[in-house]
């Protein structure tokens, strides 16, 4: 199973970063490779959402069930998509009132070797850039 772990120290609160990452409906506005998104279910502690990823003529949609702990974490597990397994999440560790560590940790395995060959590089690229994309988005939304 492949693993991705990316993190950044940002000058925004854990609460602010949680809200940006949890705003799935806005992903296509700023997340490279994201061509669409849809929130299917939502409550204060839970969300089911789909994200469409497109690049180089290849498009895939995956759906996750997300357990929400506001300002602390978003734990994700696969509902549907091109994966045999996808789990992990976002973690927000306060450093002080106006700074935090943002971390994305994922474990995944594609449903077939063919899908991995077609989509693996695109998914790796997307996940590698996600923390940076959210950091840039925070600067746009909350200011430098």
UniProtKB/Swiss-Prot annotation:
GO terms (BP aspect): cellular respiration
Alphabetized UniProt keyword annotations: Toxin-antitoxin system
Keyword Repeat part of the UniProt annotation: no
Gene Ontology terms for molecular function: ubiquinone binding
Lineage: superkingdom: Bacteria
Role this protein plays: Toxic component of a type II toxin-antitoxin (TA) system. Binds to 50S ribosomal subunits, preventing them from associating with 30S subunits to form 70S ribosomes. Its antitoxin is unknown.
Assigned protein family: Belongs to the ribosome association toxin RatA family.
The protein's name in its UniProt record: Ribosome association toxin RatA
């Amino acid at each position: 199973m492949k693993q991705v772990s990316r993190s950044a120290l940002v000058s925004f609160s854990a609460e602010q970063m949680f809200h940006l990452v949890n705003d799935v409906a806005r992903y296509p506005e700023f997340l490279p490779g994201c061509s669409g998104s849809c929130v299917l279910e939502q409550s204060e502690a839970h969300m089911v959402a789909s994200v469409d990823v497109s690049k180089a003529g290849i498009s895939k949609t995956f759906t996750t069930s997300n357990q929400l702990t506001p300002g602390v974490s978003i734990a994700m597990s696969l509902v549907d998509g091109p994966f045999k397994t996808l789990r992990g999440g976002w973690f927000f560790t306060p450093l002080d009132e106006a700074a935090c560590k943002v971390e994305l940790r994922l474990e995944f395995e594609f449903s077939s070797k063919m899908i991995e060959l077609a989509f693996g590089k695109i998914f790796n690229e997307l996940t590698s850039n996600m923390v940076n994309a959210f950091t840039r988005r925070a600067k746009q939304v909350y200011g430098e």
